[in-house]
């Protein structure tokens, strides 16, 4: 056995023939001695591609150290299956690491051949190449795919799998039905069934279970064919297969009508495993109108029905995972034989079962995410999008919310746009669930970095909600709270503050003072206070919000708790208490990794702010390492042109500068600076903040005139948007004074330093590190102008306060003690 043998289905003891295909596949894979060239088994459904791959894995397993099976029929599930190999390979990643991080580690380990060079990965039922090709490893091992998609023929070495040759069909039936069939009868059956392996398997299972004579089987097959031909059938499935299937169901109906009813219901799920507990008793508010409610509530009926389906090889029962799987071919045939009213009835049943399964589960709650994940593969195949039932639409939007709450924004967008297209066409623009879907859509596209589109969509939707639902409807309030983020992203901080004050009042009146939704509104208002520079009020409100959210029974989600936790660490840092900010940030980061995973969007946002706190606290190496990791993760997860990635880039450039990597920092900022106006506009505070950082790096790299020009322009912009009495603006003013001093304009630098220091004391207080930096820089200018007595007095006072605030060994204190200039930079907060 290989050292790692993962998820490979059991070997089929009735496997027959295919020796030429196995030899061709084996020799083809073994011939690739320098680099892996994937091979694909291609053919229509039911020809035995999967069985051939299973047989290959078992027959040649001695040639591999690792054999890993990956169900690949839905791209959303491929990565999670591949990520499971990380643990088996004992890769050095955190147990709470995200799926993408685990997949990257697995692909890298396979590419390097460490710890194993001989590996085989089997992607079963792969769809379009672009869905899977990105996660196919390259290295010294082998990759085998099975697929019905002809597109693989232009991508990989492909082996076409056709129906059995007649002698293989006969040999298979003789093995499958020992002592129950003659060779001539096997020939007759193979002819009638078109030599399709799946059809032969079903026929063989029926023969074994019932002992039916072949003549009777063929007569029934002929009689059932006429009815089946009267309904539509999939174009790539032969008639003989549909006839064989219908006969199996007909015989099963005589033994267990309940089993047939259950099977038909399962045909309207997706082809992924169906959790067994979906078929448990329905809650009372869902049981009304359910055609299966009686059976679902009676294990004496349900258990035998499931076992009958297994005996007839119509489902695969996995007792370990407690799931039931119906082959997609069987599902298609089952659906096609039913009249449309029956199809609609079974679809409603499946929708009810799906919705009931998570009726009590909050999609924001990370504890509920595995449950939602298990249902994800059934949403589109069951046509949830077509339902007009309010309970089902509510469930559908909860799935969207689960996706973006867990960080899968792209899948959330794809799903909600499918819902909107259908629901608007059926129900019109004023339907409550259409409006709610648009609210979710705006959240998703904002999280994907399309901030202007989110703003415009929320503006339109808010107007419709107020008109259709009313000012104080729950959906209207939820959108109002979300829309505050749009205003913050636009740099309209004062308008966002007014908006969020009103939102909080409405939430308190509607939900109460400590409801989880009210606490979200409080968190947003605390951020507004921060952006407007009122750090005392921001700290008070943020601490109150966090206290309520952390209480047992608050109902707040892990990501909302983490957002508030990080907000508290950030405001403590901006108040100048760097050591305590690090402590709070460390706790928040550990919570994010544990509750969400290390690459969840909110965990990465916390990591970015923790890096800033470490840098401010003088922990330069730790800050740089964390900033570098965070920037790489953001690029990988959301791309370079995203607000979180841009913020992580500034954090990294600042950490590089602090660590002395001046050239690298400047190169990064030269790339980032043009992206900020494209994201936020030409007159946004964050754009000016990025320019401030760029100017700083230009000056320390010797480009003095350009630095001065950029800082002057940035200061004018910040004066206009935020006024001079703001933390961001005063930071730019400190750096502009340093530009002037570097160019020899010492007196102008001193004058700017004096006015800036006065404002810093008024805004931040005498002991804030930024105030002390302004004072320390003014000391340098006074010394350069020969005003030594004035400089000495200011220096002594500044150092006393600095050492008390940051300690004698802090890098900034050392610079001030040596009468050298201090530089400060800008870090955009999470909005």
Can you name each region flagged by the protein language model?
Residues 397-404, 432-447, 474-489, 516-531, ...:
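Conserved alpha-helical positions within TPR/SEL1-like repeat arrays
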Residues 593, 604, 615, 627-776:
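Eukaryotic tandem repeat interaction scaffolds
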Residues 386, 425-430, 467-472, 505, ...:
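Short coil/turn linkers that connect adjacent helices within long alpha-helical scaffolds
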Residues 1-425, 429-440, 445-467, 490-505, ...:
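Aliphatic-rich helical/repeat scaffold segments used for oligomerization and domain docking
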Residues 766-769, 776-777, 784, 788-831:
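C-terminal non-catalytic interaction modules
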Residues 460, 464-467, 471-482:
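Eukaryotic intrinsically disordered, low-complexity regions
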